[in-house]
UniProtKB/Swiss-Prot annotation:
Belongs to the methyltransferase superfamily. RNA methyltransferase RsmG family. The gene is rsmG. This is Ribosomal RNA small subunit methyltransferase G. It is an enzyme of class 2 (transferase). It catalyses: guanosine(527) in 16S rRNA + S-adenosyl-L-methionine = N(7)-methylguanosine(527) in 16S rRNA + S-adenosyl-L-homocysteine. It comes from Rhizobium meliloti (strain 1021). Pfam families: GidB. One of its GO terms (cellular component) is cytosol.
Length: 213
């Protein structure tokens, strides 16, 4: 592993045991990516920085034994990475929602072989709230624009007494998505600068409600 990556992992306070699990996941990922499209092929050479480190920052923003729902889990970013981090916590779980059967199969193998705390739900996102009635946190990466993501999250975040918080990776044009979303929703927003890409952010959203016309 490059010295710069090791330094970045140390900065995120990742234990040696977790790094070993992440390395095993990376090996599995590279193997499966030869036969199914898990991420854009052009990003495979930069797997650790572009995907693993980018995903790790979510757990740093909301550590501890929480119940997560990861929407459109795809190649496991950030859901499997969060589940690996939770393997050292006393509790917590990640529900990985992925309707593509091939990707869901990969996710099951990744969870099993890394000892991560999670399970795979091979269903459409719209069906997930009926199967996963509550959660502490929601994550999604490279899935949809913010308005659509909030529609997906609404069944959990609008439930009475809900304290669910959502975390979304967004690129340099995130403000346009925020401006569009506030025409339909009210929410508390914290913008966390990405530790990987200087123009990117992680949006932390809480106290969601729909605007009334």
């Amino acid at each position: 592993m490059q010295a710069s990556l090791t330094q970045a992992l140390n900065g995120l306070r990742v234990s040696r045991e977790t790094v070993q699990k992440l390395e095993h996941f990376a090996s599995l990922f590279q193997k499966w990516a030869r036969s199914i499209n898990l991420v854009a092929p052009s990003t495979l050479e930069d797997l650790w920085r572009r995907h693993i480190l980018d995903s790790l920052q979510l757990y740093q923003l909301s550590p501890g034994p929480k119940t997560w729902v990861d929407l459109g889990s795809g190649g496991g970013f950030p859901g499997v990475i969060t589940a690996i981090c939770l393997s050292e916590a006393e509790g917590g779980w990640v529900h990985l929602v992925e309707s593509n059967n091939k990707k869901a199969a990969f996710l099951r193998v990744a969870l099993r072989e890394t000892g991560a705390r999670g399970s795979v739900h091979p269903i459409r996102i719209e069906a997930a709230p009926a199967e996963i009635p509550s959660c502490d946190a929601i994550s999604a990466r490279a899935l949809a624009d913010l308005s659509q993501l909030l529609d997906y999250c609404a069944p959990w975040m609008l439930a009475e007494g809900s304290g669910t918080v959502a975390f979304f990776h967004k690129g340099r044009d995130y403000q346009q998505e925020v401006d569009k979303a506030v025409s339909r929703f009210q929410f508390d927003l914290i913008k966390h600068a990405s530790v990987v890409e200087p123009d990117s952010v992680v949006l932390e959203i809480a106290n969601l409600s729909r605007r009334t016309k």
